Curated annotation (Swiss-Prot):
Transmembrane feature ranges: 289-309
Species of provenance: Homo sapiens (Human)
Signal peptide (from-to): 1-27
InterPro entries (alphabetical): Cys-rich_flank_reg_C (IPR000483), Leu-rich_rpt (IPR001611), Leu-rich_rpt_typical-subtyp (IPR003591), LRR_dom_sf (IPR032675), LRR_TM_domain-containing (IPR050541)
SMART domains: LRR_TYP, LRRCT
Name under which the protein is recorded: Leucine-rich repeat and transmembrane domain-containing protein 1
Length: 345
């Protein structure tokens, strides 16, 4: 009897846990919706209904997400964490959310994202990272996101974006990139090429407006011609690996080349995207070609006119001298014929 009573009590407690709604939250069981927004929460509430599909946690004071922070809601599809104080996302913070489709992390204090942070979100369709302080995104944030269609990273501190990260999102159709600190140098050429192909295929983007260097500040990256890019310099050889032993050096002494303290600065300057220098005499060359063509045309016309004039003059002269000559020749022929006829047979 006591065993049955204990079992019954356990079932009651379990049902209360499953069906309960956390304090300061509003739960709607018919739609599996839980709203815990604007409650001054500092951490994720415990005892969330496991059948929750939509969870709103925006406008709180959550600073940190531990690993497996949402293990109690494995069926979650929409998660809104916007306008909190998140600065640290532990690896595996979203582990177990196999069905998550929408993740909103806008208006937080994120500085960077750990590689493969979202690797457990295969169904993710929308990721909003806008209005943070992110200065760098890794080349990968997880497995290939076959279903991701919207990525927003506007209003951050990004200077570069690796093309490999975008190539891991073959289905993306909307890309929001504005209001960052884009440095339009040679390292952004790969991104430019990817964006041109993306737009050509019908993708939508708000563009990349260059913040530096001053030559291109305020310009749209997609409107800068390819010809204006300088190739990125090759990485400087490692002085340690490039050590060489000169022939004839005594006792195997290794001579190191002198260090160039300005190499890094020079590489940075060479890498700046700057206009391709145009030859100083290019306009003069074009003008020379045009003038030469005009002169040659005039000379050809003059030669043609001279040829026509010469032929006409020759024809008129021949006709003029041909008439009298014919008349003077005829009497000779007659006289010769008479002498021939009068000769003895």
């Amino acid at each position: 009897m006591k065993g049955e009573l204990l079992l019954f009590s356990s079932v009651i407690v379990l049902l209360q846990v499953v069906c309960s709604c956390p304090d300061k939250c509003y739960c709607q069981s018919s739609t599996n919706f839980v709203d815990c927004s604007q409650q001054g929460l500092a951490e994720i509430p415990s005892h969330l209904p496991p059948q929750t599909r939509t969870l709103h946690l925006q406008d709180n004071q959550i600073h940190h997400l531990p690993a497996f922070a949402f293990r109690s809601v494995p069926w979650l599809m929409t998660l809104n964490l916007s306008n909190n104080s998140l600065s640290n996302l532990a690896p595996g913070a979203f582990h177990g959310l196999q069905h998550l489709q929408v993740l909103n992390l806008t208006q937080n204090s994120l500085l960077s994202l750990e590689s493969r942070l979202f690797h457990s979100l295969p169904q993710l369709r929308e990721l909003d990272l806008s209005s943070n302080n992110i200065s760098h995104l890794p080349t990968s944030l997880g497995e290939t996101w076959e279903n991701l269609t919207i990525l927003a990273v506007q209003q951050n501190q990004l200077q570069q974006l690796d093309r490999a990260l975008l190539e891991s999102m073959p289905s993306v159709r909307l890309l929001l990139l504005k209001d960052n600190l884009w440095k339009c140098n040679c390292h952004l050429l790969g991104l430019k090429l990817w964006l041109e192909k993306f737009v050509y295929k019908g993708g939508l983007t708000d563009g990349i407006i260059c913040e530096s260097p001053d030559t291109w500040k305020g310009k749209d990256l997609l409107r800068i011609p390819h010809e204006l890019y300088q190739p990125c310099p090759l990485p400087a050889p490692d002085p340690v690996s490039s050590q060489a032993q000169w022939p004839g050096s005594a006792h195997g002494v290794v001579l190191r080349p002198p260090e160039n303290h300005n190499a890094g600065e020079r590489e940075l300057l060479e890498c700046e995207l700057k206009p391709k220098p145009r030859p100083a005499n290019l306009r003069h060359a074009i003008a020379t070609v045009i003038i030469t063509g005009v002169v040659c045309g005039i000379v050809c016309l003059m030669m043609l006119a001279a040829a026509i004039y010469g032929c006409t003059y020759a024809a008129i002269t021949a006709q003029y001298h041909g008439g009298p000559l014919a008349q003077t020749n005829d009497p000779g022929k007659v006289e010769e014929k008479e002498r021939f006829d009068s000769s003895p047979a």
